[in-house]
Regions:
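P-loop NTPase catalytic core of nucleic-acid-dependent motor ATPases
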Residues: 1-100
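Conserved nucleotide-sensing/catalytic segment adjacent to the nucleotide-binding pocket
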Residues: 94-131
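Conserved small/polar residues in nucleotide/adenosyl-binding loops
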Residues: 132-133, 137
Length: 143
C-alpha cells in the first residue's frame, strides 16, 4: 500500500465543532458539504472523481488554514507547492506520483493559462511525462 494516512479512525469521535465553526465563518453554508465531499474524494487513491477545487478569496480570510488542516490529515500523501510549476517545470510532475492531494495556497491566476498538464493529472487522460533526476532514481533504488 502506497498511501497511509497519519490518523487513527475513531468511530466515537466527537463532532468537530471548532472545525465546523471555522468553516461556517469562511464559507457559505451550502459550500461546507461540498468541501467535505471534496476532502473525502481526496482520501481515495484514484482520480476517477476527476477532482480539483479552487477556493477564491481575499488574503487573510483563512483559506491557508484549510491547507494546514489538510496537511495534518494527509501528511506525506500531500504536496504543497505551485500549480504553475507543474506546467513550467518538467521535474515537478514527478513529485506528484503517489500523492493524494496537491495544495497551492497562493495560486496566481496566470498559472491557469497553461492547464494541459494539470488537466492530465486531474482527469488521468493522456500520458503524463514524469521525469526524474538520476539522483532521485538512486534514492529510489537504495530505499
Amino acid at each position: 500500500m502506497r498511501c497511509r494516512l497519519p490518523v487513527a479512525y475513531n468511530p466515537d469521535a466527537p463532532t468537530p465543532t471548532r472545525w465546523l465553526a471555522f468553516l461556517d465563518g469562511l464559507l457559505y453554508p451550502e459550500d461546507i458539504p461540498t468541501l467535505q465531499e471534496y476532502i473525502g474524494y481526496c482520501l481515495i487513491p484514484s482520480n476517477k472523481g476527476q477532482r480539483m477545487m479552487v477556493i477564491k478569496g481575499n488574503g487573510g480570510e483563512g483559506k491557508s488554514q484549510i491547507g494546514a488542516v489538510l496537511s495534518a490529515l494527509f501528511g506525506s500523501n500531500m504536496k504543497d507547492g505551485s500549480i504553475g510549476k507543474i506546467s513550467e517545470n518538467r521535474f515537478a510532475r514527478a513529485d506528484l506520483e503517489h500523492i493524494l492531494l496537491c495544495v497551492d495556497d497562493d495560486m496566481r491566476m496566470e498559472a491557469l493559462r497553461q492547464t494541459n498538464y494539470v488537466k492530465s493529472i486531474v482527469t488521468a487522460q493522456g500520458k503524463i511525462c514524469l521525469l526524474y533526476t538520476s539522483r532521485r532514481m538512486c534514492w529510489s533504488i537504495l530505499a
